[in-house]
Amino acid sequence: MSALLNITEPNNNTNTKNDHFLASLTTDATQSTASKYSREQIAQLFDLPLMDLLLQAQTIHRQNFTANEVQISTLLSIKTGNCPEDCGYCSQSGHHRDKTELVAEKRIEVSKVIAAAKRAKATGSSRFCMGAAWKHPSAKDMPYVVELVKEVKALGLETCMTLGMLDTDQAAQLANAGLDYYNHNLDTSRSYYEQVVSTRSYDERLDTIANVRNSGINVCSGNIVGMGESRDDRIDWVHELLKMPKAPESIPVNLLVPIQGTPIGDKVLAEGQLSVLEWIRTIAVTRICCPSSYVRLSAGRESLSDAEQALAFMAGANSFFYGDKLLTTGNASQSGDDRLMRELGLTKQFSAPRLPKQVPVLDAMSGHQSQVILASLS
C-alpha cells in the first residue's frame, strides 16, 4: 500500500491552485468553534473547487462521527397557521393566508401527538420534533408543551421543539421537563434578514438561542438557502454561528421550497431558484466550520435527485427528517428514503456518536489512501 499522503502536497494528479490555502487549515477533530474561522477564511472555503471542498468536509465528518451513519428525526406540526409573524417564505404566516390558502389548525390533542411519536419510533426515528406556529408560547400553552415533552421522552425518543421565541423562564420550564433540543433558526445573515421578516429582530432570535443555551437545552439553529440572498450572506450566516459561545449542536441547512402566495416564494418562482450545488457548498462549509454539530437536511429535499442527495451526504450532512410531511410542505417519501439509504449504504443512528478520531480516507484526487490534516485557526 502506498504511503499516506497529505492532500495539500502537490502531485501529478492534483490542481495546486488552492494548496496554500488548504495547508493553512486543520481538522483536529477535538476542536470546537473555539478555533474560529475568520470571515475571509469562510469565503475561501466557499470558493474552493467543489471536489476539494467535499473531500475536506467528508474527512472532517469522519473524524467526528461514524461514517455512513445518519440521525433520523420526525417533525410534526402541533399547531398550524395564523402565525402573527410575517416571515416572507412561510405559508403559516397570518399575513399571507389570503394568498396561500393554508387551513389553520388548533393545537393537536396530546394523545394524537403521542400516537404520531410512537409511529415515528417504529419507523426508526430517534428524535421527535414538534413545531407550533406562534410568535412565542403563551402562559396557557406552557403546560401543554411541557406535558408533550415528558410523554414523548417516556417513549424513549429524543425531543425537540420549535415554538417561536422563548424567555428565560420558558426555557427553564422546558429544560426541567427534559427537552433535549430547541430549534430557532437564524434563517439568513443579519444584513439580509430585513428582506425576510420584520416582526422579529435578528437580535431577538439570538436572545432566544442564548436563553436556550443557558438553560442547558441543546441548540438547533440553521438557515434557509435560496431566498434571494447572496453568497456573501451565506458566508455571514456561517460566521454568525462561529460568533456564538458554542456552535449549535444541530444545524438544519434548508433549501427554500418556494410557496406560491408568499412574498419570497413568488419572487423566487419568477426569478429562478438557486443552484442545488450552492446549497451543497453551504452544507460542506458548515460541516468544516462546525465539525461536531449534526448537519441536517430539511426542507427542499423532496425535489432533489438521488445523486444530489448523495452529494449532500458527501458534503457532511448526517441527519434528515423522515416522513412524508414536514410542517406544511411535502417531504421525501419514507419508502424512497429507505431505498436511497440502502443504495448509499447509510444506516440509522440509534446511539450517541463515537468519540472523535483520526480516520484514513481515500484521496479522491490521487487515488492513494491519505490522511487529511487541516490546521488550527486562531
Curated annotation (Swiss-Prot):
Keywords: 2Fe-2S, 4Fe-4S, Biotin biosynthesis, Iron, Iron-sulfur, Metal-binding, S-adenosyl-L-methionine, Transferase. [4Fe-4S] cluster binds at C83, C87, C90. Pathway: Cofactor biosynthesis; biotin biosynthesis; biotin from 7,8-diaminononanoate: step 2/2. It comes from the Bacteria. CDD domains: Radical_SAM (cd01335). The keyword S-adenosyl-L-methionine applies. Signal peptide: none annotated. The keyword DNA-binding does not apply. It catalyses: (4R,5S)-dethiobiotin + (sulfur carrier)-SH + 2 reduced [2Fe-2S]-[ferredoxin] + 2 S-adenosyl-L-methionine = (sulfur carrier)-H + biotin + 2 5'-deoxyadenosine + 2 L-methionine + 2 oxidized [2Fe-2S]-[ferredoxin]. NCBIfam families: bioB. Homodimer. Belongs to the radical SAM superfamily. Biotin synthase family. This is Biotin synthase. The gene is bioB.
